[in-house]
Design a protein with these regions (language model features):
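A short, exposed loop/beta-hairpin motif centered on an aromatic-Gly-Thr core
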Residues: 27-37
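Short linear proline/tyrosine/threonine-rich motifs used for host-factor recruitment
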Residues: 13-15, 22-24, 30
């Protein structure tokens, strides 16, 4: 028999494997997975435990006959210890019918880069998340875009020109509400640095800054963030990123739990071609006691409504990115569906909730400098757009849930907000069957 011991600060949880049975004993509650063999034993074990300790700051110690050094474990005495730095969670919950991309985040769209700067102190929980649609010069090679305001209690910047011209010409920044002027200034400054023609031989630039109010966990009046924080996030642009209480999501609260940055992607197949549609959210909405939370179709809020009550307010910003060749009219139709994904998590878009959505396609680059009177673009026929609608709804719902599942307990100047995993017994029961990770 192999024995696995999971240690945290207060308890030892024992997992045993014997013949064709995997048994979990957690807080005196027994869970049994049957009809497995030694070949898939390891996978079942890791899927359960990796998810369980992700936000628990615990350790997994293995004592048994299987060499786990090629499976995220390091040698420790006569046994092995799980190295969480080697584990990349890609999915905690399965939403909908469509397949996800490999990373299950917005970087599954080829060329998309994300950079973040997080500020976490006793007084401040704020930051900035930067999304660059492609590695090139966004001002000189703009992307087709659209926006939609579902509930306009918000201060996001740059939407007027998006709606008029149908393009985006800067990276998209996501931050706290009172930071938007500082971050917009930084976006402009970086654009001027990269494009000396701006304001001299060509026009000006339209910075895109999305915001949510992070005042629950952040002393936002101090406007602690600086332009250098944006520049640092920009310098950290990469094709993968962390989710949860990071970047622009550091101070966000969702359904009374720690919210923030969440993302998910969907694969769309049209004929022999494969495309990706992905969503990134900054979640900061929902009733304060969690009573409205719907988790993967289940009213989880009915079981965990123990927090201080307040109305559905806050905000959510949603960025939809796809490599489908959509024009700005079609993109607006797609991003309107974000509201359906959000509502499936329990929101009714209250009076004080600023719900704003931006969508862009990387398929057609619009050149800023060109002498041609006409340009050729590829556009998908409307008759094929239903798959994009479904992908948007599914990815938005999953991104919202991911923003909570990846977040941890956060202390601010006025409040302590717990991650959803505080209610780990309910949490485990709901998500265990669909845990996925990158191997």
């Amino acid at each position: 028999m192999d024995k696995i011991c999971f240690y945290n600060e207060n308890n030892i949880y024992v997992i045993k494997y014997n013949d064709d049975e995997l048994k979990f004993i957690i807080d005196d509650k027994e869970t049994v997975i049957t009809e497995i063999n030694a070949l898939n034993y390891l996978q079942n074990l890791l899927e359960y435990l990796i998810c369980y300790v992700h936000n628990k700051c615990g350790k997994i110690i293995y004592e048994g006959s299987v060499n786990l050094e090629n499976h995220h474990f390091n040698k420790l005495g006569s046994g092995f210890i799980l190295d969480l730095n080697k584990v990349k969670i890609r999915r905690f919950v399965k939403i909908g019918k469509m397949s996800t991309g490999k990373k299950n985040n917005i970087c599954d769209v080829n060329g998309v880069l994300v950079g973040q700067k997080s500020i976490k102190t006793d007084k401040y929980n704020t930051g900035v998340t930067v999304v660059k649609p492609h590695p090139g010069n966004i001002f000189k090679e703009k992307v087709v875009a659209a926006s939609h305001v579902h509930n306009g209690f918000g201060k996001s910047m740059g939407f007027v020109q998006i709606d008029e011209l149908g393009t985006i010409e800067t990276p998209i920044a996501i931050t706290g509400t009172l930071n938007i002027g500082i971050i917009a200034d930084a976006v402009i400054e970086k654009s001027l640095e990269e494009n000396p023609e701006i304001g001299i031989s060509t026009g000006t630039v339209n910075p895109i800054v999305l915001e949510c109010n992070d005042s629950t966990l952040n002393d936002s009046r101090d406007r602690y963030i600086t332009k250098d924080d944006y520049f640092e996030a920009y310098s950290n642009l990469n094709d993968d990123f962390s989710q949860g209480a990071v970047g622009g999501g550091c101070g966000m609260v969702c359904h009374g739990f720690k919210g923030g940055i969440g993302s998910s992607s969907r694969i769309i197949k049209i004929g022999d071609n494969e495309y990706t549609l992905a969503v990134l959210v900054n979640s900061n909405f929902g009733s304060g006691n969690g009573q409205d939370l719907i988790f993967n179709g289940k009213r989880l809020g009915d079981e965990i409504k123990t927090l201080q009550d307040f109305e559905d307010k806050g905000s959510i910003t949603v960025l939809v990115v796809t490599d489908l060749p959509l024009d700005n009219r079609q993109l607006k139709r797609v991003v309107k569906r974000c509201s359906m994904g959000i509502s499936r998590t329990g929101s009714f878009a209250g009076h004080g909730s600023g719900d704003v959505f931006v969508g862009l396609s990387t398929a057609n680059k619009i050149k800023h400098f060109s002498d041609d009177a006409f340009e050729n673009v590829i556009r998908m026929r409307d008759g094929y757009i239903n798959s994009a609608f479904r992908a948007c709804v599914e990815a938005t719902e999953e991104a919202v849930l991911n923003s909570m599942l990846f977040s941890e307990k956060t202390s601010g100047r006025r409040n302590v907000i717990f991650g959803l995993n505080k209610y780990y017994q309910t949490y485990i029961e709901k998500i265990t069957p669909v845990i996925e990770y990158l191997k």
